[in-house]
Amino acid sequence: MISAPVMTMSASALGRSIAAGEICPVELVEAYLAAISAHPDGERIYARLTRARALDEAMAARGRAQAGLRRGLLDGVPLSWKDLFDSAGVATEGGTALLRGRVPERDAEVLQRLTRAGAICLGKTHQTEFAYSGLGLNPVTATPPCINDPEAVPGGSSSGAAASVAFGLAALAIGSDTGGSVRIPAAWNDLVGLKTTAGRLPLAGVLPLAPKFDTVGPIARSVEDCAQVLAAMENRPAPDLRGSTLSGKRFLVLEGAPFEDIRDVPARGFEQAVDRLAAAGAKISRSKLSSVEEALALSPIIYTPECYAQWRNLIETAPDLVFPPILDRFRSGRDHLAMDYVAAWQSLSDHRAHYLAQTAGFDAVILPTAPNLPPNARRLMQDHAYFTTENLLTLRNTRIGNMLGLCVLSLPTGVPSVGISLMAAPMAEDHLLRVGVAAETALATD
């Protein structure tokens, strides 16, 4: 019999308990499926369950555990998947009515990899339409709840992914991040979110938004979980996080744009977190970086044309089926000139190189994950201008990491719905995770 506290254990802790024979994967999956069915918001979190698949995979995991043939720490651990990862024979609809009834024949490559590692697919979680909003509101399918405010949105676009973990309905979630879609819902639901470097993990079988920026990443209860699942998706050993310390680590607080129009609670929560990092031995510097400001200015020229080009043909067949603010945002990309788009990419490449030169020698650049708290869902529905303003504000800080091609880790600060982000150089995830686990410990210290 699986007790309630087990449902909120980290994925890594569950894996160790399975290895020790303390938890049976079949009983664990049955407990998660029962909890999802019984939860009053279960259908707002999960678009659909893969019940038969989950039970089959759990029985196979149980057999491997009994035979001493487990494939890794996550063997037998139940995960949720955002509804833009293809799942063979099960609908993958990307949060939009325009893809209703779309059933792929093959699993996404990353789902195949985690299945080979023994992880169990519980089902597909709700998301914002086409993954094109950071708020988590989706009036077309469902808007999952926020763990800290039942009237607020949960953050997006990996909204159901974060809710599935926060409400104890999955041990870990796999989401995607194009402009903040892993980190924002992680922050607003007091979880850990990892944005991986673009190109690090394969996108085969993942519904695209802006392919040059699309990334796969986990939302989890711990940094260790993020390290374990990233390693499993790459079929390699996880980095050794033991002994990580902040002593002597150099952090740069990114001033300027990340603090414009920041709300009081995120501002205070961030500064309290910085104080804790300093108390744990981190050396804190502060600076505004021209490369960041200039890269952000290019965002509308680069993002919106790429997103609109990706989905224009489908959207324009039935635009009335798309939530108006999402439709307007897509269409804002149709009037940019090709020469401006190309020139913007050339400039962005220069800004990326300049940023890396400006931040060389720092272990991480830190900033508030989001400058605001989760907005009220009803107001967002009723006031489309408010939706647009809050969406752009919500995504501003996280988009910095995407524009500059970085890997980024968002950690809970201890203040509800306030996250702190640590940014590191491209492909430096293992270093970031080692720094992150030490920061995680410092932030959890009273």
Where do the PLM segments sit?
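Acyltransferase
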Residues: 22-30, 59, 265-288, 312-317, ...
